[in-house]
A protein has these predicted regions:
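His-Asp-centered metal-binding catalytic motifs of divalent-metal-dependent phosphohydrolases/nucleases
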Residues: 84-102, 108, 112, 134-143
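Active-site flanking loop/helix segments enriched in acidic
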Residues: 44-62, 95-100
Length: 239
């Protein structure tokens, strides 16, 4: 399902919206806070514990908001998907920015996805569902790709992006959005600095990605790979 299709379903809603089925208390018509809800599955509970144990507050809040925005998108479009996969992939999509899951070799999205998939497998998810968790986390910042993967991946990327840059929220109940976004103020600066910290020992992974401008601004000596020049300089280009 492409993001265009998802957005096409995102008309304004009346009344409250139910949170994802992973949460208790669905009899209430109000969207419940992730931080105070109790997930129904062992994996969902473990994912919440892992997030809380490893992540600073600004990332915990961002991941909670992203899950709740995903629930709005799902409810608005009456979208059928694997709620547990969506929940775990979105909740853990930034683990790679934490000290525990930092990798000196791969992008933080991949480190996050690896950790999320490992947790999913440890709690009994099938290889296919765990691979989908990996996609949700790894591809969350690649809208042009995630749109054409699973529905869970498309919804997750859409929700996470809405929290980071604030687009596409005017189609939802403004009171619900205001409650979800109460913790959003002051997120951007520590988020950017977390990316900078993660890139210090692997600045090259930012080249030709959405992190390029951050690396160029904050990391001395960062050099953006020029794919055009490298392709033209390939010795096989002019044998």
């Amino acid at each position: 399902m492409s993001r265009r299709e998802l957005l096409g379903h995102g008309a304004a809603m009346t009344g409250g919206l139910l949170a994802l089925g992973l949460f208790a208390g669905q009899a209430s018509a109000a969207v419940r806070s992730v931080s105070t809800s109790t997930p129904r599955t062992r994996l969902a509970k473990a994912a919440e514990r892992l997030l809380q144990e490893t992540s600073p507050d600004f990332l915990v809040d961002h991941c909670h908001r992203s899950v709740e925005l995903a629930s709005l998108i799902v409810a608005a479009g009456n979208i059928a998907l694997d709620e547990e996969v969506l929940f775990v992939g979105v909740l853990l999509h930034d683990l790679g920015l934490t000290q525990r899951f930092h990798s000196s070799e791969v992008r933080f999205e991949v480190a996050s996805a690896n950790a999320a998939r490992d947790l999913a497998l440890d709690y009994g998810l099938s290889a296919a569902r765990a691979a989908n968790v990996w996609d949700v986390a790894a591809l969350h910042a690649t809208g042009g790709i995630s749109d054409f993967k699973s529905t869970e991946t498309a919804v997750g990327s859409d929700a996470i992006g809405r929290d980071v840059v604030g687009y596409g929220l005017d189609g939802f109940d403004p009171d619900v959005v205001a409650r979800i976004m109460e913790t959003r103020a002051g997120f951007a600066e520590p988020f950017v600095q977390a990316i900078v910290a993660d890139l210090q020992d692997k600045p090259q992974v930012a080249s030709s990605t959405w992190m390029t401008t951050i690396a160029a601004k904050y990391i001395p000596g960062f050099h953006q790979n020029d794919i055009e020049q490298r392709a033209l300089a390939d010795p096989w280009e002019n044998p």
